[in-house]
Regions:
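N-terminal segments that cap or nucleate solenoid repeat domains
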Residues: 1-77
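Cullin-RING E3 adaptor/co-adaptor recruitment helices
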Residues: 2-18, 26-28, 167, 174-284
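Ankyrin-repeat boundary/"N-cap" motif
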Residues: 14-26, 50-63, 87-104, 128-138, ...
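Ankyrin repeat domain, specifically the short helix-to-loop turn at the C-terminus of the second helix
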Residues: 40-49, 76-89, 116-126, 152-160, ...
Length: 284
């Protein structure tokens, strides 16, 4: 009897593994949305007795869509299922620990269009992606990976620039470490991340502030004299920075980034890399 149950469980596990691979490949190959939804919900594809394991949830399907940049499927899942698409995935999905796994995955894979869709939908989900100090936030990750476009999208959508991880590091701390250790190749991206963070931080709080004061000769070279003095608390924000900080405080996250793009100010004052590229728009 026991051996029979064990054999049945093994067959169920194997069948689920096979279907998972089929579904994974279908999303990877950018199959039509209707086909993917038929696969995801059709019970004929499943042999398990456990109804809870019969289908991939919208949340799990969205993770596949993010990984393979299936923009149309991601848009469908978020539009059709809303909050359910942003729910925690099941235990069978091994994601990086995060309070917002879908945002984190979109940042990690640099899926800017899907990131924008998730941010738009997440505004309707109370408490979504709220920093709790246990994990690094998606903004921490965007800074770690030097993704300035993701940084500005997250900040404009209400991400907290001063959120701390379990070590007390803010996204600004992450960028400063990157700048200190950066090569010529990634220094420009790190600098853009820093500039974005500063514009959304009228009050600068970060763990490395004391370190900046101890080695001014190093940090003034890395940051430039004006930025160094501002971050070290030795001078107020430069006029252009102060102006943008004031302007950005007036913008609603609900209308970002369109509200920023439409501001009647010189383009040189606007952040680079505002989403979404024309190529991405055409792909959906």
């Amino acid at each position: 009897m026991a051996s029979g149950r064990a054999g049945s469980a093994a067959r169920n596990a194997e069948s689920h593994k096979c279907f998972s691979l089929l579904f994974y490949r279908a999303v990877r190959d950018l199959k039509p949305v209707w086909m993917l939804e038929d696969m995801r919900t059709m019970e004929a594809f499943y042999l398990e007795d456990d109804a809870g394991q019969r289908i991939f949830s919208p949340s799990e399907a969205l993770l596949y869509a993010i990984v393979h940049d299936h923009q149309a499927y991601a848009q469908y899942l978020l539009t059709r299922y809303g909050e359910a698409a942003l729910a925690e995935p099941g235990e069978r999905f091994c994601c990086c620990p995060s309070s917002a796994p879908h945002l984190t995955m979109a940042v990690r894979y640099d899926r800017r269009y899907i990131l924008g869709l998730i941010l738009q939908e997440s505004r309707r989900v109370p408490g979504y992606a709220r920093a709790d100090g246990r994990f690094r936030t998606p903004l921490h990750l965007a800074c770690e990976l030097l993704r300035p476009e993701a940084v500005i999208m997250l900040l404009g959508s209400g991400a907290c620039a001063s959120a701390q991880d379990h070590d007390g590091f803010t996204p600004l701390d992450v960028v400063l470490e990157k700048l200190r250790d950066s090569s010529v190749l990634d220094g420009e991206e790190a600098r853009r991340c820093l500039d974005h963070l500063i514009m959304f931080m009228p009050k600068v709080h970060f763990k490395l502030k004391e370190v900046l004061g101890k080695t001014p000769e190093v940090w003034s070279k890395v940051l430039g004299e004006e930025t160094y003095k501002y971050l070290a608390g030795q001078s107020p924000a430069p006029l252009a920075v102060s102006t943008m900080q004031t302007i950005l405080q007036q913008l609603s996250p609900d209308t970002f980034p369109a509200s920023l793009s439409e501001l009647p100010i010189p383009s040189c004052l606007k952040p680079l890399g505002l989403p979404v590229s024309p190529r991405d728009q055409q792909r959906v």
